[in-house]
Amino acid sequence: MKKILFIGINYYDYTKEIIKHIEKEEYRVTYYPLRLMDTLSRVQHTLTPQLFQKKQDRYHEEIMEKEKNNNYDIILFIQVHDMSLKNLIKLKDMHSEARFVLYNWDSVKTHDYRKYIPYFHKVFTFDYQDAEDYNLVYLPLFGIEKYTQKQVVKNKIVYFVGNVCHTHRFITLMAFIKYCQKNNIEFRYHICCSPVTVCKLLCAGIIPQHFSFYRASDLKMRYLLEAFIVFDCRNHEQNGYTMRIIENLCSGRKIITDNSHIELEPFYSKERIFVYQDLNFEGVKNFIDSERDFIGNCPGLHIGAFVHNLLA
């Protein structure tokens, strides 16, 4: 059986699902989180980033020492910027026969990983503009099975659930809440902010409201996911589609988004996807009320297709 060393961000259920689908491709997987995510490490990352990086370098060196005598067909990274270039080069020298593959679901503007690109045989990105600018392979994010297998009953309820790390995204959400209140639109949401984000908002003169420090409970998620329409607002430093868009395309929902590039996609239809600009939500009410039919889910965006493309 072929073998993969997988080093990547540990992000909710998504990492486990990626591993499961790699195994379906008949690979044996050895996985390590890319970043130390215990509470102490998170605090160190915020307060003493240089000391944290030294600690993380030692962690990566321990991984390399542990795996130095194991042979792998593929060494897969999902994100790489948390590993020093020195350690990546050392890992590549240790496993010179392996094929090195990188997937980025952040943009170069968010985390500049360009210096790492020459050390990979293939580099994928979720950001279509980065793919064009740096000659990378464009591969959108994916929908996992718990979202792709269940189709939603049509209704006029809008929902949002997600982490908000950027001031612009928070401002957009607050403006949309006001729009919905004014137009009698049912908008269900769970906005999660970290203490760091709250400090950023306060420093920008914004009083945070309508948010939580905690993830939505399973009960609240079931309530939110009764909605047939999703509201999306992207980080303006990134051009790729959010996981929110992909998952809701896969589950057959209607989408309200500010990512105008979606109008160029083969799955786009104006009956299903509404694109707003800045804080102008004119036309959203009519879009919500429209009952025109559209094509449902998008099998090409399911996680199985995503993993297959990564390993091809």
Question: In which residue ranges do the predicted regions lie?
Answer:
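Short amphipathic alpha-helix with an adjacent loop that forms part of the alpha/beta core around
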Residues: I63-N69, G283-I288
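Pol beta-like nucleotidyltransferase catalytic core
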Residues: C180, C250, K254-A312
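Active-site proximal beta-strand in glycosyltransferases
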Residues: K92-D106, F124
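Nucleotide-sugar donor-binding catalytic core of glycosyltransferases
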Residues: K2-H21, Y27-K54, R58-Y59, N69, ...
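N-terminal Rossmann-like NAD(P) cofactor-binding module of classical short-chain dehydrogenase/reductase
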Residues: L76
